[in-house]
């Protein structure tokens, strides 16, 4: 299985998504520091929200097979600049979380923001009702080589 590194703002659902992908019960847990596991690297939202911590994201990205940009479907703006993941030199996917909270037009806008930031493939998910998680797991278990281009 490929190791994912989750990057996204606070409260976007990174930890809930990690718990769902592991088959764990959902419970709120504030991530205080970068948490490593064989399956995932879970980063605190503050690392994205505070640019002086970007170096920690870049360094941690070296240990990941895939970068996962995470943004909730009801987000009002994108914290990711265009080409955000280019310096990480890793294939990137976009995960739109909390899809049960937004209209399709809003979900499309959030997916476009993730594409502009560098996501080569987008997954629409909801940890609450487990929608979209099978597609993410299929991607992670795929034996196909990863590519850095679209």
Swiss-Prot record:
It comes from the Bacteria. Pathway: Polyol metabolism; 1,2-propanediol degradation. InterPro entries: EutP_PduV (IPR012381), P-loop_NTPase (IPR027417). May play a role in the spatial distribution of the bacterial microcompartment (BMC) dedicated to 1,2-PD degradation, perhaps being involved in cytoskeleton dynamics. This subunit is directly targeted to the BMC. Might bind GTP. Keywords: Bacterial microcompartment, GTP-binding, Nucleotide-binding. Induction: BMC production is induced by growth on 1,2-PD vitamin B12 medium. It is found in: Bacterial microcompartment. Interacts with PduU, probably via the PduU beta-barrel which is predicted by modeling to be on the exterior of the BMC. Belongs to the EutP/PduV family. Pfam families: PduV-EutP. The keyword GTP-binding applies. GO terms for molecular function: ATP binding; GTP binding. This is Propanediol utilization protein PduV. GO terms for biological process: biogenic amine metabolic process; propanediol catabolic process. Bacterial microcompartments (BMC) 100-200 nm in cross section are formed during aerobic growth on minimal 1,2-PD-B12 or anaerobic growth on 1,2-PD-tetrathionate medium, but not during aerobic growth on glucose, anerobic growth on glucose or pyruvate-tetrathionate. BMCs can constitute up to 10% of total cell protein. GTP binds at residues 8-15. GO terms for cellular component: propanediol degradation polyhedral organelle.
